[in-house]
Amino acid sequence: MLDVADNSGVKSAMCIRVKRGTSSQGNFTRSMASVGDIIWVAIKKSLPTCQLDDKKVHKCVVIRTKTPIRRPDGSYVRFDSNAAVMIDGDGNPIGTRIFGAVARELREKNYMKIISLAGEVV
């Protein structure tokens, strides 16, 4: 279970699959997601005004993890909760606001729209 940190109307979601690159047979998956990975989720809790369908699978980008992230300078950063942002087919966020801090590693993975909507980049 992870929190959804935008105003799309979804409050919590459960990860179903982690997308990690491609192979000759198609997409291959991994069991753990890190910051900047695209995951497929099932919506578990949402507001009544949410326009996303609870019965379908949706895409998210992980923006915070409890697992420490090692940076090239040797420092580690970790967050208090696992959080993601709902995205559409083009990789743009569905919501117009992002709550809480996001990791700087999203900038390296070209999620500039998420970086610009976030209040703080750690």
Question: Residues of each region from the PLM?
Answer:
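Ribosome-associated RNA-binding proteins
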Residues: 1-122
